[in-house]
Amino acid sequence: MTSLHGAESGYRTYETPVVILHTGYDLPGQQKKEKAKRNIRLLEQELKQLGWDENAGAKDGVAKAETAGTDAKACGSEQIPYLLYQLGKSYYMMGEYGAACDWFAQGLSFDLNPALEYVIDMVETYGYALINSGQEQTALFFENIYDEFGKSADFQFLMGLIYMKNARFTEAVREFKKAAGHAECRAQGVNSYRADYNIGVIYECLGKKEEALAYYRKCGGYAPAEERIRELGWG
């Protein structure tokens, strides 16, 4: 783990067996949206105080991301890319995936440390936002950052989805299998039943029913997999 700004000196870290669950967005749909709207207002105010040029904001899309990043750097604030990340997350929580993509693009226009947790999450959530907004072809540019981010189960699972959405099934299966080979992950199931389920779906679509069945059965009672087994008369 590193600090927000990537400084690693001055303190020591170690792994503990403690799991902390954040339930801040574990709310009914409308309450979640209201909380996200409140956060957006606060984040926009903070950006304005830091000298962020609102005319280069997310509403102008990816095309202005590089210019926006340059303007932010001129303000001399290392907080700005993190605030842009939080804005993207807030729009993502509201289901406004296109707007989330624009904010993430601006946040990632900075020269950031790829080891930072928030940078890793920004990259991965950006990928899901692209998929959820119908921009799966655009998401193929994640191939270009694979060397920096592609060592985790979470990123490999995301790449599997990107390939799957683009009907590149061989690459998708490869990435899901790589994800399933990890002992640890951040998002639940991406290194186990969710990866196996998607491999099963691909094999079923390709007419490889025996292979599909084998992967569905590896999902350990995962409801969508059990449903596929029943629907196909294999249960």
Write out the residue ranges for each language-model feature.
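Single-residue signature of alpha-solenoid repeat helices
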Residues: A100, T138-A139, A172, A212
